[in-house]
Amino acid sequence: MNLKKIICWPPLLAGIGAGITIAILGYITYESFLSSTDYGLWLIASFGSTVVVVFGYPSNEFAQPKNVFFGHLLTTLVGIIFVTFFEISFISIGLAVGIATMLMIAFKVTHPPAGGNPIAVMIGGVSFPFLVFPIMAGAITIIIGGIIY
């Protein structure tokens, strides 16, 4: 068995890159000096799907930095607007996801993992600071990891 072939196997490298990036976000969220501050949340569930796209399919349009950053930013903003101005219901959650999807496609920043952000935002009842931590900070961390990869 060729060791170089095993070490350079793309799925292995993608898994390592994804795992390290999520571990970094997890460390910042749970172990770093930021963890007990308002800046401590750097990890959300949709980032798990994001690293699959970024590290597993780096040449895909959905994995490009612009799509990762603005896809997460846009969908989270839609969720925050909905949770701020509308009562949470199956209708408002569905509308938020639909509008977020429409906007990602219209602005050419589609990033499918970000489609879940309005759901998480509305269920969690978060507000505008959520756009910075974890969304922008986490997306930038993933983008940097993807560039290094």
Annotate each language-model stretch with its function.
Residues 1-73, 77, 81, 86-94, ...:
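Alpha-helical transmembrane segments and their membrane-interface boundaries
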Residues 98-102, 117-121, 140:
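Hydrophobic transmembrane alpha-helices of multi-pass, membrane-embedded glycosylation machinery
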Residues 110-111, 115-131:
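Membrane-helix boundary connector in multi-pass membrane proteins
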Residues 1, 102-104, 122, 136:
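Detector for methionine-enriched segments
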Residues 77-78, 106, 118:
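Active-site beta-strand/loop microenvironment that shapes enzyme catalytic pockets
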Residues 87-111:
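Internal alpha-helical transmembrane segments of multi-pass membrane proteins
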Residues 58-67, 105-115:
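Membrane-helix interface "capping/anchor" motifs
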